[in-house]
Amino acid sequence: MANHKSAKKMMKVIAKRTLVNKMRKSKTRTAIRRLVDIIKSGDKENVVLAFRNAESNLHKCVNKGVIHRNTAARKISRLNAKVKALMTA
């Protein structure tokens, strides 16, 4: 348990940040899951919109410091490869 006043405040701030970061990660995972489901269904019309949404969420997480930029780049690259494979098929 924190002994200093500033440490007690930081515990509250960390708890709030943790909730916000969990929300952002969850939103991003949901967007990725939706994109993968659309790719599996073979829906070429909605796949571009879903990809933009997933990519946007990943970039937002990077800008807020929730995930590392290399992690986001890797995920975007892999998703983009799946989208391109669907579009050419």
Curated annotation (Swiss-Prot):
User: Known InterPro entries for this protein?
Assistant: Ribosomal_bS20 (IPR002583), Ribosomal_bS20_sf (IPR036510)
Question: Would the keyword RNA-binding turn up in this protein's UniProt record?
Answer: yes
**Covalent S-S links between cysteines:** none
Which biological process terms from the Gene Ontology are attached to this UniProt entry?
translation
Instruction: State the Gene Ontology terms under molecular function.
Output: small ribosomal subunit rRNA binding; structural constituent of ribosome
The yes or no answer to whether the keyword rRNA-binding is present is: yes
Keyword list, A-Z: Ribonucleoprotein, Ribosomal protein, RNA-binding, rRNA-binding
Q: What Pfam families does the annotation carry?
A: Ribosomal_S20p
> GO CC: one term?
cytosol
Instruction: Give the similarity note.
Output: Belongs to the bacterial ribosomal protein bS20 family.
Matching entries from NCBIfam families are given as:
S20 (TIGR00029)
Q: What does this protein do?
A: Binds directly to 16S ribosomal RNA.
Q: What is this protein called?
A: Small ribosomal subunit protein bS20
Tell me which species this is from: Wolbachia pipientis subsp. Culex pipiens (strain wPip)
Lineage in the entry? Bacteria, Pseudomonadati, Pseudomonadota, Alphaproteobacteria, Rickettsiales
